[in-house]
Regions:
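Bacterial N-terminal signal peptides that target proteins for export
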Residues: 1-8
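C-terminal motif of bacterial Sec signal peptides marking the signal peptidase cleavage site
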Residues: 16-19
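Short, low-hydrophobicity acidic/polar segments
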Residues: 71-174
Length: 311
């Protein structure tokens, strides 16, 4: 009898531990709800899912349908593939719907959550965006490529694994970054210049829409001097939101004089045949200056603008 009195509690303890994947919850808490995800990218122009490389880091933030924070988890050394599964364990397992938000590529040196995720009061007050310097520029010119996604996971779609409720889903990620490779020819090699893209898209709500109030940003890069062909690269965040107002500007560093100033979407990108901002994220911009003080602007090989200029 004494042997049974000793062994039965041990057996019960082992049962509890294994039923919750080795986790023991205090005060009679339920075993966790396990949210499992396999994120992927697929634009309307892609025939099959893709799994971008170099994501490195991803944060998943989970709210209930009323906007209360239920939990979050940051994954490091992230590798996306069709076999990748990322798991978030929640002690609350009685929600009908879990609202899940994803920021992939959210490198700490480039981006920030305001307020900090652990201090989020509600979904409506959560924002995410670039770290900006005092002059409104990203702290890192070529910040990490960014992806966003969201999905509502319903408890009705769950299954039981051990004593835990498991919900599996495949969230779609949308790329939020754009690269502009600017190549300049025909300009005096010694003239110090820089390119800027000015916009209002430095910060987002957790659902991926522009934050309110909007936060202005200047994406800037100096154009190296001393060669007949000069090249630089700018990276921006998402441009296809209808409320973004990107302006492409070329300036002289020494005088501040503007050499070029365009509405990037209306005057330039909008003139590209078949332009689809949800699909296109790399743009090669050629600025060809001529001795007659004219400039021709091409994007991805298409001439989108030409006119006379004085400087």
């Amino acid at each position: 009898m004494k042997f049974l009195q000793r062994i039965i509690p041990l057996l019960l303890l082992a049962l509890v531990a294994t039923s919750c994947n080795g986790l023991i919850y205090e005060q009679g808490d339920d075993c966790p709800t396990l949210l499992r995800f396999t994120p992927y990218v697929q634009t309307p122009c892609m025939e099959a899912p893709a799994y971008p490389q170099g994501v490195d880091r991803m944060t998943v933030v989970v709210f209930n349908k009323e906007g209360k924070l239920l939990g979050y988890k940051t994954f490091k050394d992230v590798v996306l593939s069709e076999k990748s599964v990322f798991e978030v364990a929640l002690s609350e397992n009685k929600e009908a719907v879990y609202r899940c938000f994803f920021w992939a590529g959210d490198a700490e040196e480039d981006y920030t959550y305001i307020p900090e995720i652990s201090k989020l009061p509600t979904l409506a007050e959560a924002t995410f965006g670039l770290k900006l310097s005092a002059n409104g520029r990203p702290e890192n010119k070529l910040f990490h490529t960014l992806y966003h996604g969201n999905i509502d996971v319903r408890n009705a779609d769950s299954h039981i694994e051990g004593a835990s409720t498991v919900l599996y889903s495949k969230p779609l990620l949308t790329e939020y970054s754009n690269d502009f490779v600017v190549r300049v020819t025909g300009l005096r090699e010694s003239m110090p210049c820089r390119m800027e893209i000015r916009d209002n898209n430095a910060r987002y709500s957790m659902n991926g829409a522009l934050a309110s109030p909007q936060v202005n940003v200047i994406y800037a890069a100096d154009i190296p001097s001393g060669a007949p062909r000069r090249e630089t690269t700018l990276r921006t965040l998402r441009l296809d939101d209808a409320t973004t107002q990107p302006e492409l500007v070329m300036l002289r560093n020494d005088t501040g004089e503007e050499l070029l100033h365009f509405d990037l979407k209306k005057d330039l990108l909008g003139k590209l045949p078949g332009y689809r901002p949800e699909c296109d994220h790399l743009f090669v911009v050629d600025l060809k200056f001529s001795p007659s003080m004219a400039v021709e602007i091409s994007i991805n090989g298409w001439v989108v603008h030409s006119y006379d200029i004085e400087f």
